[in-house]
Amino acid sequence: GVLVGWTKSGSRPIFDLVSGVSTGALQAPLAFLGPRYDALLEEVYTTTRTADIFKGNGIGVLVKAGLHKADPLRRRLDDIITDRMIAEIADAHREGRRLYIATTDLTNGRAVTWDMGRLAASDRPDARRAFIEIMLASAAPPGLVEPIPLPDPTNGIAVLHGDGGVMRPIVVDPAMLRGARKQTLWVIANGHV
C-alpha cells in the first residue's frame, strides 16, 4: 500500500505523531513503528481473509448488536501485536512521539481518543490486552461487528465502543501538534474523505 510504496521511494519520514481510526487503527501501530514493519503490514493486508476477521454471530445478533463476533480479529491482532511492539511503542512515547487511536463510545454517543503510547508505557500488566481491545473497538463497525466493552477513561466503568469513524473519521486535534518541531500533516485515508 501507500506506506510500503512511500518507503520504497526513500522519502518516508519517521512520524512524530500517528493517529488511526477504523481500519486505520489496525495500521497505525505499524506505521508508527516505521519501515521495519512494512513486510508485516504488507503481509497482513494482502493475506488476511474475511474468515480471519469475521465470524457470524448467529442468534447472538439479537443480544450482541452485531452480525459478526469480534473473536477472529481479536485472535489475529493477538498474533500481530507482540510484547516487543508494545515495548517499542513505549520507548517511542518516552522519546516524545505520539500514537493515538479513536473509538466511538456507543453507550454515551461520543468520540474517545486513546493515547496508545501512554498506555504502552504505563507498565500496566494488561497493557497489551487493552491495546488490542482498543484497536479492535476502533475497527468494529456498529451493526456489523459486536461492540467492544472498554473502560470509560473518566470513571473506569465499562461502556460499549465501536468504529471510531462513526464520530471522528480523522483524528487531528491542534493540541496534538503543539510543540512539534515541524508541522507537516499527512493524511492517508481509505475510501472517501
Predicted segments with their positions:
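Catalytic nucleophile serine of serine hydrolases
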Residues: 21-22
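Patatin-like phospholipase
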Residues: 1-17, 32-193
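Hydrolases whose catalytic domains are alpha/beta-hydrolase-1, hotdog thioesterase
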Residues: 27-30
